[in-house]
Amino acid sequence: IKDMVDKMVEDGIAYESQGATVVDIAEPTDTKELPPCIVRKSDGAALYATSDLATIVEREKLYKPDTYMYLADKRQELHFTQVFRTAKKAGIVRPDADMRFVGFGTMNGKDGKPFKTRSGGVMRLEHLISDINEVILNKIKENRSMTDEEADNISKIVGLAALKYGDLSNQASKD
């Protein structure tokens, strides 16, 4: 990573700004202002962008792919725009390389905010299924007369179908 960033500086692609090493990624055709890509923090530490660029270097050496496709949370669009433009500007990939970002929506909690996966603040699938089954089981018991076993069986089938439908009926880019 250090060699990659040092080469960007030597080639005049990256420069120091407020102690950090950055690459300007703005293009004349941009309709909005894009901040530079930070490739090294002022304390010398690497960032996600730096790791992503190093990964692209490695993939170019090993595979020389025709297309790079990154699927991630849609909130990462700016990050990947910065990484892709830096990779092209630094000559890590050819200027016409096909680099695509596909953003998907987030799974949100009851508060409407995305789950915090790093801090473990997510609902486990088994708990979600259990909660759905419980709601459906209660509805069945309210409105139908059948054995507990039959009601439990139906709630599991309907619950799983509802979960699948809810997941697949939304556009991937929606939260």
Give the role of each language-model region.
Residues 1-175:
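Alpha-helical recognition segments enriched in aromatics with Gly/Pro capping
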